[in-house]
Amino acid sequence: MTQRIEVGGLQVAQELYDLVAKEIAPATGVDADGFWTHLGAIVRDLGARNRELLQKRDEIQQAIDKWHLERKGQPHDAAAYKTFLEELGYLQPEGEDFEATTENVDPEIAEVAGPQLVVPINNARFALNAANARWGSLYDALYGSDVLPEDDGAEKGTRYNPVRGKKVMEYAGRVLDEVAPLAQGRHGDVVAYNLVDDNGRKRLQARLSDGSETGLADPEGLAGYNGAEDDPTVLLLRHNGLHVEIQIDREHLIGKDHPAGVKDVVMEAAVTAIMDCEDSVAAVDAEDKTAVYRNWLGLMNGDLETSLEKGGKTIQRRLNADRDYIGADGRALTLPGRSLMLIRNVGHLMTTPAVLDADGNEIPEGILDGMVTSLIALYDLKGLGRYRNSRSGSMYIVKPKMHGPDEVAFAVELFGRIEDALGMERNTLKIGVMDEERRTTVNLKACIREAKERIIFINTGFLDRTGDEMHTSMEAGPMIRKAEMKSSRWLNAYEDWNVDIGLECGLRGRAQIGKGMWTMPDLMKGMMEAKIGHPKAGANCAWVPSPTAATLHAIHYHQVNVAEVQDRLAGQRRATLDDLLTIPLEPSPSWSAEEIQQELDNNCQGILGYVVRWVDQGIGCSKVPDINNVGLMEDRATLRIASQLLANWLHHGICSEEQIMETMKRMAKVVDQQNAGDPNYRPMAADYDGSVAFQAACELVLKGREQPSGYTEPVLHRRRREAKAKFGA
């Protein structure tokens, strides 16, 4: 039974109350009980509006379902459908042209294009690794990944392999040729680097293997250095707004094998990182929410630490310090040692038992997230922490899963109330709008208008957006297979539309226009071939699954000047509303029994592999092996798309409930085997009826049509609490 404190018209779980009163509030100047009083007032004033918006979602969905059912068996009439959506209020007027006016935005968001990490904030090690992924070793990323083949004696092995090391150095040299080309020759031919004076500014000089000397093709590419001018230990380069270090040490195990003594090339990598309270996190009660907020506190005050065992040694992880150099102009130069951190709060749907209102009802979780994470951000805004996160005096909150401009307006109103409660200046709280719901996509310009003074981020997300696409049009007919979605008309239009509308609304120089996640952290060669498409599409950030991926993806932002791409794209609209409203239906399904079973196997295995860790162990994001044992980074978005596709096929008779249950049981055995090495794992196949996780997975599919917008949170939260009560974990 949760112990609660009555304060401010609320009933607050004891552990959360203590966290605020004893750990968060004292240094901020905010009275702890006054904080809860403000929250109570916000809940009373805005709670009903929150519920109205959710009711509106349901009413719109019911109307769309009814429209499709009335035309069942008829060819889809796109023109009539569009008119219906306008009359329904689903499609809203775009309104006049405008430009965002957001101010006090850090350059990492407003000016610099680069990789973005997203990590579950309740995992301290992941959070610290992400915050510290601002800088990453290119040598390590290349040596340990599949970017370089392991043939011709270049195996990774268990200890350093000089043959592989040579290939790493050659690849890194080619990267330097793109980042900071020499006036003559290549970095791979350099045998010594040094610095010379040039009218009061240092200039890089390189001696080549033929004895000739050269400099950078663009001398301004040298930003700074460390060490002696005739024997530097670090050369700091700058290109497309990103920095790269050449680290030199001829005595080093690696450096001694390089002609110029280069022991590493360090990339400025994850310029920004989203600390996630949402889709990658399993936080279902006061205990879980308290852990989430405590880690955010540790990131803001600089005290977060964790330890891990590596090679028989205990390693302490903490936030990295800033990096100091001598600037090329001779003055001291300091660069941030950490990624600029944003935080993703939950959306408008869920409520939380961590705090109850005066009537004993759970309060909206998004309102609680906003208040507590903003209170904690005062450590940064008031300079109370060990390091600064925002140097512009802003806090960056990403809001997910909003449906249309009214819901964005509600979030903006909430932010204003939070600022008033915490004594912040207006528009201190900036907003990132995830474009991952269909009603937001088709009304994106109107959504941005509602947040035009706060907007710092929009992005696309294939997985959630496809889940909503399928749920919205559930009654329209059977959907195409999951793999075919990526080449569908609506999806390509969605990706272009997001960039074009963002540029049209003046986000350039003020906000990020982002692209989605590469979900295969072990397949870096594939990422290097494919993900350059994101900067080429005009996105100034894109999601990566690991610090290694961030280091490698950073290369793409040297190969592509995103600012120039955005210049070319400005003023265009490459997609139309008609494209966006194209429903991804299979009008005449002719799949073979084998193809149908293949789709069932693939999706059931993925659902079970993710849900079993979520429900039984509270792991909201992890590398889950797929049916071919390829590790995929899974979160609730991947679960949403898989469960909604199967729910759609079941509803339209492509498969039967018996087929799904047979597949679920067979795939549970596969997942059990894949997790056999995990001592904390509870097998599902030993007792299907008794496995809470197995039952949760089945419920998500068999009752997928009933889930609000196809979301998985209601089932997952209820089942996770059931598992905690049953197993005590």
From Swiss-Prot:
Binding site for glyoxylate: 344, 436, 461-464
Pfam families, per database record: MS_C, MS_N, MS_TIM-barrel, MSG_insertion
Transcription regulation found in the keyword field: no
Main location: cytoplasm
Known cofactor(s): Mg(2+)
Reactions it catalyzes: glyoxylate + acetyl-CoA + H2O = (S)-malate + CoA + H(+)
A GO cellular component entry from the record: cytosol
Ligand binding (acetyl-CoA): 118, 125-126, 280, 317, 545
GO term, biological process aspect, one: glyoxylate catabolic process
Alphabetic keyword roster: Cytoplasm, Glyoxylate bypass, Magnesium, Metal-binding, Oxidation, Transferase, Tricarboxylic acid cycle
GO MF annotations in UniProt: magnesium ion binding; malate synthase activity
E.C. number: 2.3.3.9
InterPro entries to which the protein is assigned, alphabetical: Malate_synth_C_sf (IPR044856), Malate_synth_sf (IPR011076), Malate_synthase_TIM (IPR001465), Malate_synthG (IPR006253), MS_C (IPR048355), MS_N (IPR048356), MS_N_TIM-barrel_dom (IPR046363), MSG_insertion (IPR048357)
Top-level EC class as recorded in UniProt: transferase
Cysteine sulfenic acid (-SOH): modified positions: 621
Metabolic or biological pathway, per its Swiss-Prot or TrEMBL entry: Carbohydrate metabolism; glyoxylate cycle; (S)-malate from isocitrate: step 2/2
Binding site for Mg(2+): 436, 464
Function of the molecule: Involved in the glycolate utilization. Catalyzes the condensation and subsequent hydrolysis of acetyl-coenzyme A (acetyl-CoA) and glyoxylate to form malate and CoA.
Subunit structure of this chain's protein: Monomer.
NCBIfam families assigned to the protein according to its UniProt record, in alphabetical order: malate_syn_G, PRK02999.1
The family this protein is said to belong to: Belongs to the malate synthase family. GlcB subfamily.
Name recorded for this polypeptide: Malate synthase G
